[in-house]
């Protein structure tokens, strides 16, 4: 979570969206799809040294696992005013590729549906939403997935790339992944907007001790900072969330902000690794982006899942 001085302006985002519409196919092909092509039916991951096919045999949860066998529960932080304008688009696009998709709001909506939490809307209550949502998931869904991701209703996630990343991780270890910021918490904390992922062991520790206000703030302040402090207090480690070339996988800003390097002025005060731009900054196996409008979500679906170049 950034203070207001670090949040992109509406004007900048609008300009960048126009750039994306005019050059999006080329951008997405180069940044995300180069050597990493997927379809809704059969997943393929390409690397210079090997080819992975979706029919590979998986192993135990404590070792490498076939990506399509990795179970990920995703929960979306939303609100009553955003259900039709934002949350519904998440559900129609990338959210349907999660193994389980839950929406949490301050109000229960049985039609959408959303799970109502004991809190009110507003930025000052995002911490309460987060801790209550994870507590609900601990009590009702701990055994339904190996990994548990929190995202916003303006986050876009490429689930195939997330599963591929997690397939080499151990969900029995107390870890959580995301875009790492460095101030305020000794080990740093992961950006809420970029989305962060807890292992089952991390969720288990939170479920058993997360109600203790001495360990975990229950409301107020910046949600991702407070939750990062909570994770540290529970012995949950932040570990590397970049690819083998050091390029970022989780992204707390709009795609063009990362690609063109138009970051907020104080980004390197916050970023654990120096923020870079272009192909040196964004992994070709990128997992998430933030500040993604409903229109852009649908465009990303088009570019990623429906347009294919002819093979040579």
Ranges and model annotations:
Residues 2-312:
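Secretory-pathway lumenal glyco-enzymes, predominantly type II signal-anchor Golgi glycosyltransferases
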């Amino acid at each position: 979570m950034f203070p207001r001085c670090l949040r992109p302006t509406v004007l900048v985002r609008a300009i960048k969206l126009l750039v994306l519409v005019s050059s999006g196919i080329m951008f997405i092909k180069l940044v995300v799809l180069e050597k990493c092509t997927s379809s809704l039916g059969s997943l393929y991951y390409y690397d210079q040294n090997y080819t992975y096919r979706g029919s590979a045999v998986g192993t135990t949860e404590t070792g490498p696992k076939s990506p399509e066998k990795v179970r990920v529960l995703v929960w979306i932080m939303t609100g009553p005013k955003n259900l039709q304008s934002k949350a519904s688009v998440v559900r129609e696009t990338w959210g349907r590729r999660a193994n389980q998709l839950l929406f949490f709001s301050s109000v229960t909506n049985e039609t959408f549906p959303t799970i109502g939490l004991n809190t009110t809307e507003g930025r000052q209550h995002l911490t309460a939403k987060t801790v209550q949502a994870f507590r609900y998931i601990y009590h009702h869904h701990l055994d339904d997935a190996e990994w548990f991701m929190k995202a916003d209703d303006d986050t876009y996630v490429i689930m195939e790339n997330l599963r591929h990343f997690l397939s080499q991780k151990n969900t029995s270890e107390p870890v959580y992944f995301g875009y790492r910021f460095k101030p305020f918490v000794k080990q740093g904390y992961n950006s809420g907007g970029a989305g962060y992922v807890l292992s089952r062991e991390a969720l288990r520790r939170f479920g058993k001790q997360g109600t203790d206000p001495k360990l975990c703030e229950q409301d107020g302040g910046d949600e991702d900072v407070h939750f990062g402090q909570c994770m540290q207090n529970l012995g949950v480690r932040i570990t590397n969330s970049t690819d083998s070339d050091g390029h970022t996988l989780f992204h707390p800003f709009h795609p063009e902000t990362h690609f063109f390097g138009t970051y907020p002025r104080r980004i390197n005060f916050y970023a654990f690794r120096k923020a870079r731009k272009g192909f040196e900054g964004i992994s070709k196996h990128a997992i998430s982006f933030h500040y993604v409008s409903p229109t852009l979500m649908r465009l990303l679906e088009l570019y990623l899942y429906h347009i294919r170049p002819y093979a040579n």
